[in-house]
């Protein structure tokens, strides 16, 4: 389990990105890169890290399921992820 502070910081970044998304889009369309540069750093979507919603783990993150490989494996074995079953060929 990740530290609560790291998870909270990532949530704060996500909110910042959502808050400035429209303004950032407008400035980018105008080509006003100087104004974009003056926006807060955390308002850039590039600074977001994918984190597992179950454990908060930043590594081994699977975007499609929004969870880490470890949590994915655990939930898949229990049959708690719809449409996912163990492969065999």
Swiss-Prot record:
A biological process term (GO) from this entry: translation
Matching Pfam families: Ribosomal_S14
Annotated GO MF terms: rRNA binding; structural constituent of ribosome
One GO CC term on file: small ribosomal subunit
Coiled-coil features, chain-numbered ranges: none
Record's keyword annotation contains Ribosomal protein: yes
UniProt keywords, alphabetically: Ribonucleoprotein, Ribosomal protein, RNA-binding, rRNA-binding
Lineage: superkingdom: Bacteria
Function: Binds 16S rRNA, required for the assembly of 30S particles and may also be responsible for determining the conformation of the 16S rRNA at the A site.
UniProt family annotation: Belongs to the universal ribosomal protein uS14 family.
Record note on quaternary structure: Part of the 30S ribosomal subunit. Contacts proteins S3 and S10.
Protein name: Small ribosomal subunit protein uS14A
């Amino acid at each position: 389990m990740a530290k609560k502070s790291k998870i909270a910081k990532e949530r704060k970044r996500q909110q910042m990105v959502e808050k400035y998304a429209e303004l950032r889009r407008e400035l980018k369309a105008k080509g006003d890169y100087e104004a974009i540069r003056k926006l807060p750093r955390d308002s850039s979507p590039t600074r977001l890290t994918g984190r597992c919603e179950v454990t908060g783990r930043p590594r081994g993150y699977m975007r499609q399921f929004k969870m880490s490989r470890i949590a994915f494996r655990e939930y898949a074995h229990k049959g708690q992820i719809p449409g996912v079953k163990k492969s065999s060929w």
